[in-house]
């Protein structure tokens, strides 16, 4: 499964390079387009007739070739995502953690494949540390100082979790008390990493303990 994710990530990287190169080519002729990949490409296609009048024939052929390459890459990406989606629907673990806000098809499959046996980790915090989503600790004389996140583990999975956390923060109609508190006390990026860590710990708890996701669940340390 992780191999499919690696292949998809590489194709997305190639697609981004092709789109940026296309924008640069058109910018040389004074043509600018809306930001965003989908919106920009749609505008380029809609303005093809206009571009033909402003761009030499040879360069217009290059532009059309570039658009075809981007379309082919998109088809390959869509196919890989379809295969990942089939696996996600058939796998009970992926299905269970997809209920967590911030975890979609890509994150669920990558997280389950990375985690393996959830019981190999003693706690959700240990799993979050494995992914590099906990702060570094330092200090002397019994005083512990928390630094930036360790960034250990797989950067791809960590990035998926952070993107998912940002989506939750920006789109939640009714944020949980925890989310409201962390967003009020911390900068947006720090809050996103903290929420990503919480999402990872929640996923571990569901898989290690065989629980279902409960939005209002609050963990309590034993006395």
Where on the chain are the PLM-derived regions?
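Short, surface-exposed helix-loop/turn micro-motifs enriched in polar/charged residues
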Residues: 36, 88-89, 119-120, 171, ...
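Non-catalytic alpha-helical coupling and interface elements of nucleotide-dependent molecular machines
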Residues: 16, 27, 31, 132-136, ...
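Low-complexity, acidic/Ser/Thr- and charged residue-rich accessory regions of DNA metabolism proteins
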Residues: 141-142, 146, 179-223
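Non-catalytic, well-ordered alpha-helical scaffold segments
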Residues: 2-5, 9, 16-23, 60, ...
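Phosphate-backbone recognition surface of nucleic-acid-processing proteins
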Residues: 96-188, 223
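Short helix-capping/linker segments at secondary-structure and domain boundaries
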Residues: 18-22, 77-78, 116-120, 166-174, ...
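Glycine-rich, often acidic, oxyanion-interacting loops/wings at catalytic, nucleic-acid
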Residues: 1-96, 217-222
């Amino acid at each position: 499964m992780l191999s499919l994710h690696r292949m998809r990530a590489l194709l997305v990287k190639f697609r981004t390079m092709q789109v940026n190169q296309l924008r640069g080519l058109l910018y040389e002729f004074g043509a600018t387009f809306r930001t965003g990949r989908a919106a920009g490409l749609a505008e380029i296609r809609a303005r093809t007739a206009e571009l033909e009048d402003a761009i030499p024939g040879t360069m217009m052929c290059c532009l059309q070739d570039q658009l075809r390459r981007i379309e082919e890459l998109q088809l390959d990406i869509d196919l890989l995502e379809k295969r990942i989606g089939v696996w996600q629907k058939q796998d009970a673990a992926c299905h269970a953690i997809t209920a967590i806000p911030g975890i979609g098809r890509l994150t669920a499959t990558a997280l389950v494949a990375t985690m393996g046996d959830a019981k190999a980790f003693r706690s959700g915090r240990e799993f979050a540390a494995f992914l590099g989503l906990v702060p570094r600790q330092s200090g002397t004389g019994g005083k512990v100082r928390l630094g930036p996140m360790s960034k250990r583990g797989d950067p791809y999975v960590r990035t998926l979790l952070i993107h998912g956390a940002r989506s939750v923060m920006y789109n939640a109609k009714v944020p949980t008390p925890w989310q409201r508190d962390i967003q009020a006390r911390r900068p947006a990026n720090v809050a996103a990493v903290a929420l990503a860590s919480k999402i990872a710990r929640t996923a571990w708890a569901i898989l290690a303990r065989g629980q279902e996701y409960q939005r209002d669940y609050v963990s309590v340390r034993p006395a």
